[in-house]
Amino acid sequence: METTVKIKKSVLKRQKIAAAKEAAAKGAVKAHLNNVPTSTRKMRLVADLVRGQRVTLALGILKYQAKQGARKLEKLVLGSVADWQAKNSEARVEDADLYIREIFVDGGRVLKRLRTAPQGRAYRVRKRSNHITIVIDSLKELPAAPVAVVEEKEVVATAAAKPKATAKKATGEKSKAKTKAN
């Protein structure tokens, strides 16, 4: 008899974040966009369109998408490409064949507002937001960046080389001098 283990949402989220951090360490680039004022459900529809796509194709899809979240996601993809270029300065973006390796949308903070209702009541309006995390990577292996070796020189400091601090007058001497003058 096989038993299934139910994993909490918080544990799944922690695992997802750990996997994204691990991917970023290997050469992939991770970018965040926090507190986007769109509901999580609407943004996930747009994120599902570009998940696993090449970056050039994803940008084309997002550019002509009529949904509101597409503009924000397009800027995030462009920003992550710029981050990838900064991290891998020796490689060209066109030759790297970048793709969206991972993209997920988590719920952000919910602003609660009141809307007037009949008979003196008020309805609660929830203004939802979300957090987007995207990981882009290259399909091709990139050459390793050259490692610079820095030689360390041993510096011996002598006590005579250090200048000695001059002694400061005590604050009590100044106050005594002022009282004598008065």
Curated annotation (Swiss-Prot):
Tree of life domain:
Bacteria
Location of region: Disordered: 159-182
Q: Which GO terms describe its cellular component?
A: cytosolic large ribosomal subunit
Q: Which GO terms describe its biological process?
A: translation
InterPro entries noted in UniProt: Ribosomal_uL22, Ribosomal_uL22_bac/chlpt-type, Ribosomal_uL22_bac/org-type, Ribosomal_uL22_sf
Molecular functions per Gene Ontology: rRNA binding; structural constituent of ribosome
Q: Which CDD domains match?
A: Ribosomal_L22 (cd00336)
- Is Electron transport one of the keywords UniProt gives this record? no
Which keywords label this protein?
Ribonucleoprotein, Ribosomal protein, RNA-binding, rRNA-binding
Assembly state and interactors?
A: Part of the 50S ribosomal subunit.
Q: Which PANTHER family match?
A: CHLOROPLAST 50S RIBOSOMAL PROTEIN L22-RELATED, LARGE RIBOSOMAL SUBUNIT PROTEIN UL22M
Q: Which family does it belong to?
A: Belongs to the universal ribosomal protein uL22 family.
Instruction: Give the function comment from the record.
Output: This protein binds specifically to 23S rRNA; its binding is stimulated by other ribosomal proteins, e.g. L4, L17, and L20. It is important during the early stages of 50S assembly. It makes multiple contacts with different domains of the 23S rRNA in the assembled 50S subunit and ribosome.
**Name of the featured protein:** Large ribosomal subunit protein uL22
- Species for this entry: Cytophaga hutchinsonii (strain ATCC 33406 / DSM 1761 / CIP 103989 / NBRC 15051 / NCIMB 9469 / D465)
What gene does this protein come from?
rplV
